Amino acid sequence: MKRLAKRLQDFNELVMFQHSVFSLPFIFIAMIVASNGWFGFKLLILGVLAAISARNAAMGFNRYVDRVYDKENPRTAGRPSVDGRLDGGSIAIFTVVNALVFMAVAYFINDLAFYLSLPVLMVLLSYSYFKRFSSMAHIVLGISLGLAPMAGAIAVLGNVPLWSLLLSIGVVFWVAGFDLLYSLQDMEFDKTNGLHSIPSRFGSDITLKISALFHVLTVGFWGGFVFAAELGLFAIAAVIFAALMLSYEHYLVRRDFTQIDRAFFTVNGYLGFVFIGLIILDKVSL
């Protein structure tokens, strides 16, 4: 039993399950808006399973193909995929199983979700290779998580309304923006090892400016989402709160690069959960 618990702990550390807080709220924001309130326990369970299995597949694949780089990077050398706790075969099986679970769950959601499940997986897995040849990997990561709100709308409605597209584009720039900040930690390592990123190509000052621009766009697209979905004051408050949190994130990082982890996880985690809380209040108050 202890061995199983340790194994599960290692896989949890491998995929950093706690980082699911970035995508889960926005899937359910879309589902709440699409259903005009409550979308049912069936879709709740299927939505959670789809989000977690898709993310596990993407993270498992990333850890598998990046082992050679992670081993050399002091920041990542302690990962289970590198230090011997999990071998390549175990990680590969974990990735394949989660990919199959994702497709199976999509089948039980609706036809469109199932038909799109394989293309979505291809997008999620492609991120792992982009740093090898393009500085646009940050955008690809943003797109990977930005698919979540559209997926939520598809689960409920079977189509992609304009408001879900605006919400998704906002998530793309939100994620790409904070990934730029997070990547500042690996700027020198990427330069030395021939990996492509905006920080390694343009330096920290330009990276900070691009990240800030992305987050301005985030707020703009989320404002468009509120307008297109005809939401109320609580939803407007959610966008204002997001703007304040993103400003605070940039304040932390500009003041001290050692605050990047705090800015990355804590600030963005609060942003997602408060955002969905205010959207729920908006629907309840109508």
Give the label of every model feature segment.
Residues 16-24:
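Membrane-interface helix starts
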Residues 44-45, 49-51, 67-118, 192-233, ...:
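Multi-pass membrane catalytic core of lipid/isoprenoid biosynthesis enzymes
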